[in-house]
Swiss-Prot record:
Residues 230-386 form the JmjC domain. Keywords: Chromatin regulator, Dioxygenase, Iron, Metal-binding, Neurogenesis, Nucleus, Oxidoreductase, Phosphoprotein, Transcription, Transcription regulation, Zinc, Zinc-finger. One of its GO terms (biological process) is positive regulation of DNA-templated transcription. Residues 714-724 have a biased composition (Basic and acidic residues). Its EC number is 1.14.11.65. Binds 1 Fe(2+) ion per subunit. The PHD-type zinc finger mediates the binding to H3K4me3. Binding to H3K4me3 prevents its access to H3K9me2. The linker region is a critical determinant of demethylase specificity. It prevents the active site of JmjC to reach the target H3K9me2 when the PHD-type zinc finger binds to H3K4me3, while it favors selectivity toward H3K27me2. This is Lysine-specific demethylase 7A. A zinc finger (PHD-type) spans 37-88. Fe cation binds at residues 282, 284, 354. It comes from Mus musculus (Mouse). It is found in: Nucleus.
């Protein structure tokens, strides 16, 4: 003591002298900072990671490892004397035990205080109590039966017991594996957390000291090890977690390798407990599910179901100051007892409240995992932990960060399921909703500062939350509609065992990723340049590859006769809206994708994917028996096209009806109808196969009339500046144009067919294309509309002439719209006089302006006008989307823009161009950008 006092005095004097020197010489450089104070006999500075104890005599601090005092022993010391002081004042004084039922055993046992959990009296009483058997709720099964498919179908809501290791995928050391082997693989210097059961308090100890305690038959107290995670040790090689835990685990499936956050290691725990070790009721951190396997010994689980009432009671009990004095099993309706013997494996689901008693010395292995089956319960448990102010040591590491990773991945999963036409399972939808709610809560202004730390750098929180909202809303809207069954696919992107068939969804997803990887655009391109390159690429395509996807219909026409080899690569980049071509109508169906065996590419390697799904994806309508017979009687698509072309040129309409469109496509949809009056005509034997109701007329005048009428541009087709003069090859061009719209290109065959066609006749007659092309479903279906309001009339002679000429012009113009005719039209220019053009434009404007009226927000046609209204070769943005146009969707090289550029002819000479359409750059911008009026939103 004298030496210590002298040292203190000397230190004080030195400090005073240094202070005086600094005051007397202010101009000098400041002295270096004093060294940190040192403690203990080792004279080392303070280390927060090492246990230290204070001497009650000299008031100096000593490392427990330097003076031979364990942390769990320190609580039993009443007065501590360091080695120097012990020589003068004697050894340390220990506390005296006065009870066996309280955590503080120094309290006087007057019988007034209740028993606390973990004490010797508590364990003795617990062993003597009777509980309902867990056999009432537990599910026992073989390892091969416990699959992800089973849990997704039946849920993971009750504990599962697997008596044997067979087919479970769990690999463990032999039952002869001891605590000394653990020390050898993990290392004796590793500091571990140890539970002092009698006090229900945590302390730290080296693994070597714990093994020494465990092997000692005379144990002064009960110590339990429940949190030795060994994933980063050599012992990890001896243990493989069950297959089901690995397949379901969020960490295994969603945690990115390049994350700035350290990967949570919670899958491999070694539990070593001596007899009478007890862990009070708890929910595993983050609401994780847990698996336990008893290598040797025995454990008893007390299980409580996580009902809303029980969870509320648990939170109240956990926050109570008398928690240790109340056995939680007495507060609930039922507490089940489950004995896990050597070799048994127990799976405890999310949120189950459980306590564990070690009935005999035991070594067990276990692990925790988050998964998609109970996302809502996991989030509820996490929020409960925050309200209870649970220490970070007992929380799931980076729980919020992994929630962001999972939300981002599940958003992609739901979008792919929707794209593939599958309905996500209810547990996944409910989980995404709960996750979306939690993410929104964390991003509130008053709370974002608390949660910003765990937001990953590669996640845009606001955008992700908005996208989740859209997907959830879309799923809710689709819930009432019939959809394809998804089966039970895996929602985690993991590989299945070889003996378990992979569902169609996995094959599509895998092939999609491979395809996307091959065609990935360099990241240094901006959006405008990307779309500009795509458009320029399309402009160089062959004329017969019609750009059906880019039309203003904002829909997708799936060609029945187009082989998969002719589908351009960019067709996969379409929007989600589909217009399905059925047997008789164009029907908008937003529920499912159209699938056809001929349209499958590399994405459909699975045999299950190649099954036709038209019945599940489309609304079908019965056609007349005559049309079915005609369709069945045509063995080849080419013959059907030839016959439909001949029939198109040989009939005359006498009655016409049209209707306005509705957004919904119902079963009562009716079509545009044209009834035909019968007249005598000549027909060859080959034409009798497709004869409908009217007799045929001679077609030479029809062709000439079509060509003459086509030279006069309709008001709605002004973007075509110049036209080709009539030539001897125009017949071939007209029919070849119609075939190019159908996806076929048989030029030589067409020439032979045209030569064999009878061309003698005098009168013009026109048959409805939707009827005469019964064998060509795609061409016929373009003349149908959804839910029309039907009206009809008997046409007069002048009305018939107007209808025939108007439709002939549109039909001939559409049929001639291919790249070859466009190039010819640029070479052979035919100009009309300005007076004639002005007169025609004014007369057509008067007729068209009086032909339609808006009633109840829908378009209806005046009976005096027979031609359908079209705008620039596409649907007008101001009209309903589903309204039918008598113009096929055109290739980008031939389609006019939504706002056409000014026409540089005499009719428009002197007029200012439209705003935003004066230059080619502005017009290209109109093509690349979204339509601003809200209708037909899509990218080219």
């Amino acid at each position: 003591m004298a030496g210590a006092a002298a040292a203190v005095a000397a230190g004080a004097a030195a400090g005073a002298a240094a202070a005086a020197g600094s005051v007397s010489a202010p101009g000098r450089a400041s002295a270096p900072p004093p060294p940190p104070p040192v403690y203990c006999v080792c004279r080392q500075p303070y280390d927060v990671n090492r246990f230290m104890i204070e001497c009650d005599v000299c008031k100096d601090w000593f490392h427990g490892s330097c003076v031979g005092v364990e942390e769990h022993h320190a609580v039993d010391i009443d007065l501590y004397h360091c080695p120097d002081c012990a020589a003068l004042h004697g050894s340390s004084l220990m506390k005296k035990r006065r009870n066996w039922h309280r955590h503080d055993y120094t309290e006087v046992d007057d019988g007034s205080k209740p028993v606390q959990a973990g004490t010797r009296a508590f364990v003795k009483e617990l062993r003597s109590r009777v509980f309902p058997s867990a056999d009432e709720i537990i599910v026992k099964m073989h390892g091969s039966q416990l699959t992800q498919r089973y849990l997704e179908k039946h849920g993971f809501d009750v504990p599962i017991m697997v008596p044997k290791l067979d087919d479970l995928g769990l690999r463990l050391p032999s039952p002869a594996f001891s605590v000394m082997d653990v020390e050898r693989y993990v290392g004796g210097d590793k500091v571990i957390d140890v539970i002092d059961v009698a006090r229900q308090a945590d302390s730290k100890m080296t693994l070597h000291n714990y093994v020494k305690y465990f092997m000692n038959p005379d144990r002064p107290k009960v110590l339990n090890v429940i949190s030795l995670e060994f994933s980063d040790t050599k012992m990890s090689e001896l243990v493989e977690v069950p297959d089901i835990a690995r397949k379901l685990s969020w960490v295994e499936n969603y945690w990115p390798d390049d994350s700035v956050f350290p990967k949570p290691f919670v899958q491999k725990y070694c539990l070593m407990g001596v007899q009478d070790s007890y862990t009070d009721f708890h929910i595993d951190f983050g609401g994780t599910s847990v698996w336990y396997h008893v290598l040797w010994g025995e454990k008893i689980f007390y299980l409580i179901k996580p009902t809303n009432e029980n969870l509320a009671l648990y939170e109240s009990w956990s926050s109570s100051v008398t928690q240790s004095e109340v056995f939680f099993g007495d507060k609930v309706d039922k507490c089940y007892k489950c004995v896990v013997k050597q070799g048994h494996t127990l799976f405890v689901p999310t949120g189950w409240i459980h306590a564990v008693l070690t009935s005999q010395d035991c070594m067990a292995f276990g692990g925790n995992f988050l998964h998609n089956l109970n996302i809502g319960m996991q989030l509820r448990c996490y929020e409960m932990e925050k309200r209870l102010k649970t220490p970070d040591l007992f929380k799931f590491p980076f729980f919020e960060a992994i929630c962001w990773f999972v939300a981002k991945s599940l958003l992609e999963t739901l979008k792919e399921l929707k794209e593939d036409g599958f309905q996500p399972q209810s547990y996944l939808v409910q989980g995404v909703k709960a996750l979306h709610t939690a993410l929104k809560l964390w991003m509130k202004k008053e709370l974002v500062s608390e949660h910003a730390f765990e937001i990953p750098d590669n996640v845009r929180p606001g955008h992700l939350i908005k996208e989740l909202s859209k997907v959830i809303r879309a799923i809710e809207e689709e819930n009432g509609k019939p959809v394809k069954s998804q089966g039970i696919p895996s929602v985690c992107p993991v590989s299945r065992p070889s003996n378990e068939a992979s569902p169609p969804y996995h094959s599509r997803r895998k092939m999609r990723k491979l395809r996307d990887h091959n065609v990935r655009t360099p990241s240094n391109l901006d959006i405008l340049e990307l779309h500009t390159r795509e458009v320029l690429k399309r402009l160089e395509m062959c004329p017969w590859e019609e750009d059906l996807l880019s039309s203003k219909l904002n829909g997708k026409f799936n060609k029945h006769l187009q082989p998969s080899s002719t589908v351009p690569e960019w067709r996969a980049k379409d929007n989600d809206l589909r217009l399905l071509l059925t047997n008789g109508r164009i029907i908008k169906d937003e529920r499912q994708l159209f699938a056809d065996r001929s349209l499958y590419t590399a994405d459909s390697e699975n045999e299950e994917d190649k099954k036709p799904t038209q019945n599940a994806n489309m609304k079908t309508e019965q056609s007349s028996g005559r049309e079915e017979a005609e369709s069945q009687g045509s063995p080849k698509p080419l013959n059907r096209i030839f016959t439909s072309v001949r029939s198109e040129l040989r009939s005359r309409p006498s009655e016409y009806s049209d209707g306005s469109d509705s957004e919904d496509s119902g079963p009562d949809c009716t079509a545009l109808k044209i009834n035909f009056a019968t007249e005598d005509s000549e027909s060859s034997g080959d034409e009798k196969k497709h004869e409908i109701t009217s007799h045929f007329k001679e077609e030479s005048d029809i062709v000439r009339n079509l060509l003459q009428k086509s030279q006069k541009p309709s008001r709605q087709e002004i973007p075509v500046k110049r036209e080709c003069p009539t030539s001897t090859s125009t017949e071939e061009e007209a029919i070849q144009g119609m075939l190019s719209m159908a996806g076929l290109h048989y030029s030589s065959c067409l020439q032979r067919q045209i030569q064999s066609t009878d061309c003698s006749g005098e009168k013009n007659s026109l048959q409805d294309p939707s009827s005469c092309h019964g064998s060509n479903p795609e061409f016929r279906q373009l003349y149908r509309c959804n839910k029309p309001v039907e009206f009809g009339y008997h046409a007069k002679t002048e009305d018939q002439d107007l209808m025939t000429s108007s439709w002939n012009k549109q039909f001939d113009r559409t049929s001639r719209f291919n790249a070859q005719d466009l190039s010819r039209s640029q070479k052979h220019i035919k100009k009309e006089s300005s007076s004639e053009i002005n007169q025609k434009a004014q007369s057509r404007h008067c007729v068209d302006s009086n032909s339609s009226s808006i009633q109840n927000g829908k378009y209806t046609l005046n009976p005096s006008l027979v031609s359908c209204q079209i705008s620039n070769g596409s649907l007008s943005p101001e009209r309903p989307i589903g309204e039918t146009s008598f113009s096929m969707p055109l290739h980008p090289t031939k389609r006019p823009a939504s706002n056409p550029p000014p026409i540089s002819n005499q009719a428009t000479k002197g007029k200012r161009p439209k705003k935003g359409m004066a230059t080619a750059k502005q017009r290209l911008g109109k093509i690349l950008k979204l339509n601003r009026n809200g209708h037909a939103r899509f990218f080219v």
